[in-house]
Amino acid sequence: MKLPLRAAMKVAIYDLDKTLVRKATFTPFLAFAARRLAPWRLLFLPLWIGLMIGYRAGFYDRTTLKTLGMKLMLGRQELFQLEKVGHAFATRHISKAGWIPEVSALVEDDRRQGARLVIATAAFEFYARAFARMLDIDIVIATRWDGRQIPGGNCYGEEKRRRVLEALGDARPDTSLRFVSDSFADAPLLNEAQEAIFITSSARKANRAASRGWAVIAPQG
């Protein structure tokens, strides 16, 4: 996918979880979708927690973790079903968790300036697009799902940077890039951006981000 860009255009890219949205999305999505599509699979939630512990212990990577989570909690589902439940989930998640107001204000500032708005996230595309529509953002770079596996791997860290630069294509030298994220895993893309903004309420993380030359926004509430 190539971004539709004009010469010397500003591109403003936002992470989703804990950047635009206050809380993470994947585990809440698995529970929400299982309740809608396969309620008996809610019995597997303790197993899912065990899988997350295994990931943190270094037994497998995030792509494997998310693939196992989808298969365990949802089984085989058609993409249109996942998109439908993903829309319902996004609506519910925002009603409970909410947007981060300081970041929403940045989005509107970028919009007024005529920037091309993009969400780049490790979240699955089939529900990330539902969040994007709420913000009137039509470009989403996210983790894909084909019903069995994750083509191209998790859109995370260096892979996210690669996909964004691929989308910028030949326009990259003339593009002013702002990237907003809450995660040090996004350092490859934060370091690439002319304007890097880190979202955190942690003083320790704020100091670490500032030491890398990134601006810091501390969400309130």
Question: Where do the protein language model's features map onto the residues?
Answer:
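A general structural signal for well-ordered alpha-helical segments in protein cores
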Residues: 26-27, 66, 161
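Metal-dependent phosphoesterase signature
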Residues: 65-101
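C-terminal cap/substrate-recognition subdomain and adjoining C-terminal extension
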Residues: 3-5, 9, 91-221
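Residues at alpha-helix boundaries and short interhelical turns
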Residues: 20, 37, 76, 93-97, ...
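Active-site neighborhood of HAD-like aspartate-dependent phosphohydrolases
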Residues: 2-57
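Catalytic cores of transferase enzymes with a strong primary signal for eukaryotic protein kinases
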Residues: 16, 23, 34, 63, ...
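A short secondary-structure junction motif
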Residues: 52-63, 71
